[in-house]
Amino acid sequence: RNPDEMYYRESDGWYRREVLDTLDALEANGAVMEINTGGLARGKCHDMYPSEWIVAEARKRNIPLQINSDAHHPEGIDSYYGAAAERARRSGYTVQRVLLGGEWRDVPLDIPAELGMPPEGSSAR
């Protein structure tokens, strides 16, 4: 957490370099990056993370993406899924990486019902 940029500014050159180096490492190792909505859902943050510019940079590198609510209770499992999917779409993503039946698959962002999630808007948080 970095409320109101208390500790650093994401626009600072050193921070941007660290983020880009980290994304390069994710790409080199075939790792998946997540959009995490947990802090937003629990009221601890004003936004999901990572920031939109980071998601866009990940897309440029074709880093697989996963949306994660970091839910601590079942009722929060889909918290802000629609907003996270929209952030991913704006950056050019059309799928997210999901573990289904013991294997990783790329699943379209616009069909959360396939994942057993309610239709968009039915459990607005």
Task: Please place each PLM-identified region on the residue numbering.
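Charged catalytic cores and adjacent phosphate/nucleic-acid-binding surfaces used
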Residues: M6-R125
